[in-house]
Structures are given as structure tokens and as C-alpha cells.
Amino acid sequence: MNEVVVVAAKRSAVGSFLGSLKNVGAREMGVCVLKDALNASGLKPSDVDSVILGNVLGAGLGQNIARQIQLDAGIPNDKNAFSVNMVCGSSMKAIQLAHDAIMLGHDEVVVCGGVENMSKAPYLSFDMREGKRMGNANMIDSMIHDGLWDAFNDYHMGITADNVAQAYHISREDQDNFALQSQLKARAAINAKKFQEEITPIEIANKKGVVVFKEDEYPRDTTLESLAKLKPAFKKDGSVTAGNSSGINDGASIIILCNAKKAQALGLKTMATIRGFGLGGCSPDIMGICPSIAIKNNLKNVKMNLNDINLFELNEAFAAQSIAVLKELELNPNIVNVNGGAIAIGHPIGASGARILVTLLHEMKRSGHGVGCASLCVGGGQGLSVVVEQK
């Protein structure tokens, strides 16, 4: 089996819903970040064997968004590309598939990650295929229907977070405090320019000229008092609010994986070695607890234990599920999401799995920590995890 290394990890800044990236398509974002990642790696477009990208809200994007991004980025058309939809796990699953292709010897260099513009998700009408003879036509929000709605229980993902809060006895106060800490850590990281190296600036044309978007815009100033004033967002008597949940966001994340021997032969700098992955499954109605299962399976697969991990990046879909995972694994919160998480930074669903790994890799490089783990929950009751190591 071939050893697989990371030779580049880049992302866009994360845009707020209907914010700076609202008119920048997933294709355009992906091309911009992919080109920057290639430049950072020292590879040429012709060195790439395959492109594998996660995307959830594919309606209206045209055929195979990964192939569109591949060709627009200058990667030759005799190479291949495909898109992956595993809801929030899409881009991490893309990374796993890329890793496996290299490990098994099918490819040597694979671009992977994910793209998502939730702001541009279209409305759908299932009434129009055969026409409407009279009366109103129903419109479906594809962002909610395809990205945020539990297909098994017919309710919003937020209900699953309330279910986890109830099952694990997590109070509203604990959730709000967790959310506040995420915001404070993210703001401190932005002020210290910790994300600068991982972010690809994107030029956006508007009526006033060209604006360079290069800083996460979703983090917001907040207090426990302001969080406490928010009403429950999903259940009338629930504890999950807009303030202790992740956002609806836009962004792209790209990672380039390479056969270790190939990287050495080309003289490429490596950020980390991929040690392995873990998957987990649970009941869809408490999907947020699944990272704890995925991480346990991941560590078993790579013959490590929790004490071997120096840093964790856990996607903060909701404060409730994040706290539950911390409790379930008995993790030290001081080594988890040290620069804030999705509650502050945002959650562009098809790109988030790669986003947390990009951030983890750069924090490991900055801090010198040797082993890291990134994990996230997946709508429908699944979880994904990856362990990486600096050598």
C-alpha cells in the first residue's frame, strides 16, 4: 500500500448567507481555490490524475461540478473528475476516496475537497413537469430540502440537535456558552491573522469595482446576554437557537494529496501524512453524536488512542451535538477547535469536511503539534473522521 501525503491545503474565506459570495458560483470559487492550491504545492495542472469534489446542493449547477472545475483550472481533459454527495460529509468523503485511489496505486496526485454556495441554491417546483392546468404551484427551497432536512423523520436538522440536547442533558446555558467560546476563539484567530495562510483571496466584481474577499465574514460579536435572548429555532420548548447553531454559508476548500514517493521525487513540501479514516452510523434522529463513533473507529483503524491526538477539529453543526461528542469521548476542550468552529466560522455543507481539515493542517504546522484528528456529523445519521500526522 502506498503512503499518502498532503502537499497543499487551501480554502476560501467563508461567506455569510446572501453575503459577499452570494453571486460567486461554486464553480468559480472552486477554480480559484484549486489554482491557488496547485501554486502552493509546486505541482503543474498536468501532474493531477483526478479531481474528486464534494457538493450537496447540485441543482442548477450543471453536469458534474467537479469536472467543470477541473477543466476551468487547466487540468487536462484526459484526466477524470467526479462529484460526491454525502451531505455534510461530502468533502471529507472526497478526501477519503482520493486517499484510497493513491493508496491502491490507481492515481499518484489527486485534488479533493468540496464546494458549496448555499446562497445560490434554487427553488424547485415538482408541479411543472406535467404542467399545471390551474391553481397555485408549490415551490420547494432546495437548500432546506436537499441539505438541511432529515428525510427519515421529515424534520429540520435542528430538531436532531434538540434531540441530542435532551438525550445528553445539555442545558441551554451550556450551549450558549459553547457558542460564545467559539465566537471568541474565531475572532482572536482572525485578529491574529492565523487563517491568512490557508485562505485564498477571491476577487469579486461589483458596481464600485473589484473587492478582494479574504476574511471569514460570518463571525459576529456576541455575549451570553444576547445569546440568551434568542428564541428556540426548531422546537417551541427546545434549547437550540440560531446563536448556538452553525450558519448557512458559502465557501470552497481544496486539498491536494500525493503518493509520498512521488512527492519526494518531485521535491514537494508535505504538510502531513494521512494515517487513516473512520466511519460511524447511528439513528438519524440523533445524527450529531456520530463523530464520537467515527473517531473511535478511526483510532482503532490506525492503532492509536485518544491520548495520541494533539489537536481535534470537530465541525460545530450545533453546540448541543458538539458538547455531546466532547462528553462521549471525554475530550480536553483545550485541544478542540482552538481557533473556533463552524458556529463562528460557518458551515458551507459540501465544503465543511475539507475546511476543518485545512484549518487543522495549518494549525498543526503553526503550533508544531504532530497528530491531529478532524471529524464531523452527517445528516441521516452518519459520521466521518480522519487522522493526520506530521513527520
Region spans (language model):
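Conserved catalytic cysteine-centered active-site region
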Residues: 55-110, 152-156, 221-247, 328-355, ...
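Active-site-proximal alpha-helical scaffold in enzymes
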Residues: 86-116, 165-194, 254-261, 326, ...
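Conserved active-site "lid/cap" helical segment
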Residues: 1-61, 65-73, 77-80, 160-172, ...
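Beta-strand segments within the central parallel beta-sheet cores of soluble alpha/beta enzyme folds
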Residues: 46-54, 80-85, 110-115, 174-181, ...
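Flexible glycine-/small-residue-enriched beta->alpha junction loops
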Residues: 109-163
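N-terminal extracellular/periplasmic Venus flytrap/periplasmic-binding protein-like
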Residues: 11-12, 23-27, 31, 40, ...
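Active-site pocket-lining segment
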Residues: 159-162, 195-198, 275-344
